[in-house]
Amino acid sequence: MRSYPNAAQGLKLLFIAEIVAIVAAVLSLVPVVGAILYIVGLVLVLVGLHKAGADDAGYKTAFTISIVNLVVGVISGFTGGVIGTILSIVSIILDLIVVYYVVNTTANLARSRGDSELGAKGEKVWKLYLACAVINVVASLLSFIPVLAAVLAIVLLVVQIIAYILYLIFLNKAPKTLA
C-alpha cells in the first residue's frame, strides 16, 4: 500500500493554516496582528498545497486555483459596486473549487489506503461547503433586500461553522491516514 508523505505534510500545513486563520479572525480588531496572521495563514496554505502536490496532481490544481483566487482577491479589494460583487462571487466559487480538489483528492488517496471512513467524511465536508457557497452567492445577489439577506446570513453562519469544524477534523485526520 503506497503512502503519501508529501500530501500528509502538506495537509498538516493546511490544518495549521486554518487554525492561524481562526486566530487572525479573532485578532482582526488588532489591525497589524490580524493582517500579519492572515498573510501567514495564506502562505501556509500555498506551501501546504505545493508540498502535497508532489504526491497528487489534484493538490497542484488546488494550488494553481489558490494563486488565481489571490489575484482575484487583490483586484476585488480595489474595486467596488457591481464589479466588486462579481469578483466576490468569483472568489467564493474559486474557494469552493480549491476545497473540492483538496477534499476529494484527499478522500481518494485515503480510500486507496483502505480508509473508506475518511473518504466518506470528505464527501460530507464537500457537500456542506457546496451548500455554503450556494447560500453565499445567493446572499450576495440578494444583498439589496436586507431582511432576506439577514436571514440567509444567519443560515450561512450556522452551515459554515458546521462545515468548517468538519473540514478541520478532516484535515487533522488525513495526515495520519496518508503518511
Name these PLM-found stretches:
Residues 26-37, 76-91, 139-156:
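Short hydrophobic membrane-inserting alpha-helices and related fusion/pore-forming segments
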Residues 1-25, 38-78, 93-139, 159-179:
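Membrane-interface extramembranous regions at the lipid-water interface
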